[in-house]
A protein has these predicted regions:
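Active-site beta->alpha loop and helix N-cap motifs at the rims of alpha/beta catalytic domains
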Residues: 72-89, 96-99, 103-177
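C-terminal segment of N-terminal export signals and the immediately downstream linker at the start
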Residues: 1, 22-59
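N-terminal small/glycine-rich loop or linker at the start of catalytic domains
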Residues: 57-73, 130-139, 182-195
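N-terminal export signals
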Residues: 6-29
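N-terminal glycine-rich anion-binding loop in soluble enzyme alpha/beta folds
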Residues: 43-48, 67-79
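Catalytic alpha/beta core domains of metabolic enzymes, predominantly
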Residues: 168-178, 184-309
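Short, well-ordered coil/turn segments that N-cap beta-strands
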Residues: 65-67, 93-95, 124-126, 160-162, ...
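A generic secondary-structure signal
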Residues: 87-91, 118, 154, 181, ...
Length: 310
């Protein structure tokens, strides 16, 4: 795992030399990991398909059935944030709620920890995910790695959450401390990576997801920006390969933008176990589908895949 700012500065070099099979033998992923080569047709004899893992948070089983639907609170004041938490808790089509403190003014870790305890009570039986998204990854506020680590530490120690999102390309020592504390507190840790300008190669997508697993991520998350349907299909294919060849961990992958809409509703086909949806016409990322619509589409696809009595 390395710093995102270093990745951006050397993007041309990374794109030229690290995307295909040699990336799996790089210093980031040791050859001892014994990763299987990507075979788009079938597994070779002796290969075992990863055992799919299910994570249960409250009454929500992630990794089982149709992808679970998450909605984000994009509120800009504590009062409107709490109002949204209560409203989302009463929406049966939503399976989980994402708290987004990066949009709520200039709250400190202590201030949000206090606020999160009240918000958590309002969420009822819905799992609560906490995400502080930096502006460099599409969020509302830019903070240093040290500040980020202190914020998460405060919320994990004194706030109320079930599950946290950790930006993959933060300082690795900060990320590891957050993961260590989250697991000690019995919380679900989810590394994430967001590419708001482009879609990496299929093998680079796979590599980044496996980097997350290696660092202890319970759920693997990656979002890319699709500029055409081919970008979306590449993300979907990479997700399928991770699920069928490399990892049984639950995943949350998506291609953003209008060309990536299909990826948000077809996770049961590809291996993505969660999806973000829009409430009230305000998306937290480009290309989100209204929550009732995406739930309906996924249910239709599920029933067609597994017809009753078949």
């Amino acid at each position: 795992m390395f710093d995102r700012r270093s990745l951006i500065k050397s993007a041309a070099g990374s794109m030229a030399g690290a995307f295909l099979a040699p990336a799996f033998a790089s210093s980031v992923l040791s050859p001892d990991d014994k990763l299987m080569p990507v075979d788009t047709r079938n597994g070779r004899s002796g290969w075992a398909k990863p055992v799919k893992q299910v994570i249960q948070i409250k009454n929500c089983r992630i990794g089982e059935g149709t992808p679970k639907v998450i909605a984000s609170t994009m509120a800009k004041t504590p009062e409107s944030f709490l109002k949204l938490m209560k409203e989302y808790a009463e929406m049966p089509e939503l399976d989980a709620i994402e708290m987004r403190p990066d949009y709520i003014g200039e709250l400190s870790g202590k201030e949000f920890a206090d606020l999160s305890r009240e918000a958590y009570k309002l969420a009822g039986n819905k799992p609560v995910l906490m995400t502080f998204r930096d502006k460099t990854e599409g969020g509302g506020r830019h903070v240093t790695d040290d500040w980020y680590g202190q914020f998460y530490t405060e919320v994990l120690n004194n706030g109320a959450v079930d599950w946290i999102d950790i930006e993959q390309f933060r300082d690795i020592s900060v990320c590891r401390e957050i993961v260590k504390l989250a697991k000690a507190k019995g919380k679900v840790a989810m590394f994430s990576d967001h590419e708001f300008k482009w879609t990496p190669s299929e093998d680079e997508i796979i590599r980044r997801l496996l980097m997350q697993e290696k660092e202890g991520s319970d759920i693997l998350k990656l979002a890319v920006m699709a500029h055409n349907t081919g970008d979306a299909l590449r993300l979907m294919s990479a997700t399928w390969k991770v699920r069928n060849y490399y990892s049984g961990k639950p995943m949350l992958t998506m291609a953003m933008g209008r060309w990536g809409v299909l990826s948000r509703a077809t996770g049961e086909f590809t291996g993505s176990d969660l999806t973000f949806a829009m409430v009230g016409g305000i998306p937290s990322a480009p290309g989100q589908i209204p929550y009732k619509d995406v739930k309906k589409v996924m249910d239709i696809l599920h029933d067609a895949m597994y017809p009753k009595g078949a």
